[in-house]
């Protein structure tokens, strides 16, 4: 599935969203927010303040206390945008006994449009075209994450950093319009971090996709993001230009 090419239509729209367990004391209140194609938004702030819960809410896995979440024109969670949203959670959800390639193929299958460019072709030809495109996406994503030599290895034999690269490759193979990533750069050495960040950033910019990333390291967040949102008890952090504070219940 290809990313949208219309830069004037937001990929993500949040309106009056509050998350938490009690409507009277929400964990996080989010101002109205629109994320457009090509934008990378980082969310930073202290641990335990709702960053991951906010990401899960955008993914449609958690209902907000109030407000609405719209992804690619679909109101969540009632109408999830199948294939358009890629999610890299902290708990990666990889199939540990299966190979790197198998796990990345799962992402490619999730994003495949079986009609796509082959509308005029016969059904067997269409399926062959889809299969070839899916394989190409998997191979490319594995190469971008520098996992080619590990493609046949089972996940359980990989290091934590390598597993995070597999999860990232799985999402890139899906080719979503919106990527949600929760601390996806953790456990990576500096050299690997740089190459992973470059691959993901290139995908977002070249495909006109969008990305929301949770990152505890503010310096790293500033390095990757076009905009930085800070969860910090509703106070705007003055040394970060152009940020918008999210109101958080202490």
Where are these regions (language model features)?
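Conserved ABC transporter NBD signature motif
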Residues: 67-83
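Conserved ABC ATPase signature
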Residues: 154-158
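Hydrophobic anchor residue at the start of the ABC signature
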Residues: 168
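H-loop/switch region of ABC-family ATPase nucleotide-binding domains
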Residues: 215-216
